[in-house]
UniProtKB/Swiss-Prot annotation:
<feature type="signal peptide">
    <location>
        <begin position="1"/>
        <end position="17"/>
    </location>
</feature>
<protein>
    <recommendedName>
        <fullName>Hypersensitivity to hygromycin-B protein 1</fullName>
    </recommendedName>
</protein>
<keyword id="KW-0812">Transmembrane</keyword>
<keyword id="KW-0472">Membrane</keyword>
<dbReference type="GO" id="GO:0016020">
    <property type="term" value="C:membrane"/>
</dbReference>
<feature type="transmembrane region" description="Helical">
    <location>
        <begin position="18"/>
        <end position="38"/>
    </location>
</feature>
<feature type="topological domain" description="Extracellular">
    <location>
        <begin position="91"/>
        <end position="102"/>
    </location>
</feature>
<feature type="topological domain" description="Cytoplasmic">
    <location>
        <begin position="39"/>
        <end position="69"/>
    </location>
</feature>
<keyword id="KW-1133">Transmembrane helix</keyword>
<comment type="function">
    <text>Involved in vacuolar trafficking.</text>
</comment>
<keyword id="KW-0732">Signal</keyword>
<feature type="transmembrane region" description="Helical">
    <location>
        <begin position="70"/>
        <end position="90"/>
    </location>
</feature>
């Protein structure tokens, strides 16, 4: 059974397809942020170098920016996991309904 059947089954109301599309987009965007985690972890590990080459105010700003970016990456990872779980659940429901009509 193809993924397109699971996402766009004619046996289901249009809202299921809309939910699937939204979850797919959310998953893709979330994974983009989630894959930036290693980059920010490496950048956060080098804040001592920033302190050497910049003022104390710049150092505090960089630490704050680093913390925000890392938090956004972790949130992206959580959103990706949650949206993929929901997408799989919607696909499972569609599969059960689709097999009941065939």
């Amino acid at each position: 059974m193809s993924l397109s059947f699971l996402l766009f089954s004619p046996f289901l109301p249009p809202c299921f397809s809309s939910i699937s599309i939204c979850l797919s987009v959310l998953s893709t965007v979330s994974f983009f942020f989630a894959f930036t985690i290693p980059h920010y972890v490496l950048r956060c590990g080098s804040v001592d170098e920033w302190h050497i080459h910049s003022s104390a105010e710049d150092f505090r700003t960089q630490r704050c920016v680093c913390a925000v970016k890392l938090s956004a990456s972790l949130l992206g990872c959580l959103l990706a996991c949650a949206s993929w779980s929901l997408l799989l659940e919607v696909s499972r429901i569609k599969w059960h309904v689709g097999t009941a009509y065939s």
